[in-house]
């Protein structure tokens, strides 16, 4: 006969709730907990990504509204608990070791546990700030044990989920002429140019296409005049299929009856998906915790968390460039050898646009 044995391990689990800790079997509020093992086992570069799939009821989305970014290198991932709470959105109240700060500044390797308070009971402690839920992040501390040194490293790759499929230059030319016909205008692309485009797509290395020389006047190359020279997929040209990311973390932890300490050092590198230009993110984290028990009733805690992010990418708003690529004609060549004035920003040649517009470093 089969017998069911009671498993009380989860019932005895200690959960951080508001200003205190409680056993799970005494909690009546809706609380979800994520332990450090579930976070460090995933090759993520930020804490928000580590929550995905670990907590039910969380909805994630790239921050594409505030500053125009969405999915680019270093973009913050926004999330809400059980859906949007108001017409203006609203975000959960995030506390790291009792101090309000962004989850982007926390190294996932330093996390001890995360508690997500989902219902209105959190407002009893945090007031109106808890209207959209509360996320309590607890970082690792020293323990009464011999000094222990731990290293964790990971390597992974990022890939675009979905890239637009551009039409060929021949399709573009025919649709452009159909547009002109519907508007009662003459064709933008001549039949002779379309014949050259067909020949170029069949054999781009034919002697019929000698190439393009430098345009000394600097007035650019019109797509209609040189459409026979290219059949360019601009998304394939400017974006990579995959980008590498890796992280390295080392920590030392220990203590005695009177003192305890924890020191964590972290480095994260994330390569961007843009090609032909520098597009990457580097993050440095230092987390230190020291605890000294002077007497039975007096204890000193010294906590310090320092985060430095170095983001290098072309243009201040990368989404604008993404939209520019979508509007580029596939009949343009990838590199137009045009002499450009020192202080002029070419809007028709995106490669020069990237080079001349400068970089944004934060």
Walk through the language-model features, giving the residues of each.
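A general secondary-structure junction signal
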Residues: 64, 155, 306-312
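Acidic/polar loop-and-plug regions of large Gram-negative outer-membrane beta-barrel proteins
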Residues: 204-207, 217, 229-230, 307, ...
